[in-house]
Amino acid sequence: MRTALPPVTAAIALLACSPSSKAASGDSAAAATASSAAATPGRAARPNDPVAASRPSADPDFHPSWSRKSVIYEVNVRQYTPEGTLAALQRHLPRLEKLGVDILWLMPVQPIGVKNRKGKLGSYYAISDYTAVNPEFGKIEDFRAFVAGAHQRGMRVILDWVANHTAYDHEWVTAHPDYYERRADGSLMNARDNEGKETDWTDVAELDFRNPALRQAMIAEMKWWIDSTGIDGFRCDVAGGVPVDFWVEARTALKVRAPALFLLAEAEDPRMHAAFDMTYGWDLHHLMNAIAQGKQGTPALDAYFARDDSVYGPGAYRMYFTSNHDENSWNGSEFERMGANHKAAFVLDATAQRSMPLLYTGQEVSMKKRLRFFEKDTVDWTGPSLADFYSSVFDLKHTQAALANGPWGGPQVKLATDGGDRVYAFTRSRDDNTVLVALNFADKPTSVSYRGLTRPGGYTEWFTKASASLATDGKIEIPANGYRVFVR
């Protein structure tokens, strides 16, 4: 049983309203690639100062202590229940607690712009008022009640924040036209990609972070949610489209209000770790899609993790996933992209060094459909349950010291095998705890010989609970499209 979190403190002052958005019309991976490190023409250059350009700090005090063994769950409020409301969502909290969720990331809950709206209901990321709740979802009191309910069950809540752009009918468009980027003819500019080109996100206008007044207004809006609702942090949409130095400024200001604040960046640029606790692992996600489909072999993982080690270092949290709202809606479910290998891929995501695994709405009931992004499309919760699998993986994460997040976990060491390019194995150790992970992405079971296990002895296979004696050199039987995880 988790310890309940402190009750939400009432707000003392309301700050000015405002909005932000992201009209997704394609895979947002493009907005999260490492190429975001390059400054784009016409926007404030991202700083190359020593703080922003250095590897993520290994200082454990950078991250809130409560996040050491956390796992994260993305909530699509609109599609979660037939009602699509926060009150209806709150009824799922007991189930999510039982599943083992630590952090609930809510997709944007603010009102959606009407001008240039996509579809009937619009994009969650086309925000017309930063400090209000979409009436389709409920009222601010419903949001506060949800946060309080989550805290009572030991879960944290972070809110999706869209600083890069707002809806075209946000009040700032008329009240503060200087907050926005402009085309050569003076007209508002759609949100841009990492190369500075306008996207087809025609329902949102790009903000100009060269303006100090905009920066202060944006931070004020974020403070409002902390003060008024007691949320625990933010997932920042298209974070790579906003200058790193703004995020550093925002983190500093927000942590005065919430010292245990948690920030997640939709970006893969390592410099984001100057301000963010966690960044997206898009590159690993795309690699795992390719491995699951047989288009790449597991040796590619060696190159990935070597690069990750050199670029991010031990202090960073990296969010790994088999699905999220962008992947599901635009590229398909994990069943489409990974087939029978989706569970083995998730085991890797949950056990790899620096990883915090993400579970998306509906994955626990084998959701195979692509949820529509701009229309109502309720999740069918009667699908085949995978709750026991995901709960077991989360319990593995929670109980094994070697798998802790960031600087608290153990280093990842590849275990040599004769399994070829469809098998991958590694160990992680911390203090007297060792975890051995062996994965088989082939469609046939395999008996793998390994060598060089540095901590031989008695182990327990996590999922079957069978005892095993593992020698320095030995064999492991792995099911087709399967996994074996041994702990001691």
Where are these regions (language model features)?
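Hydrophobic faces of well-ordered beta-strands that scaffold small-molecule active sites
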Residues: 71-73, 104-106, 157-159, 234, ...
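Positively charged n-region of N-terminal signal peptides that target proteins for export
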Residues: 1-4
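Active-site-proximal helices and loops of the catalytic beta/alpha 8
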Residues: 42-56, 221, 227, 237-321, ...
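Carbohydrate-interacting/catalytic domains
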Residues: 17-105, 111, 144, 149-150, ...
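Substrate-binding/active-site clefts of carbohydrate-active enzymes
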Residues: 53-71, 78-87, 91-102, 108-229, ...
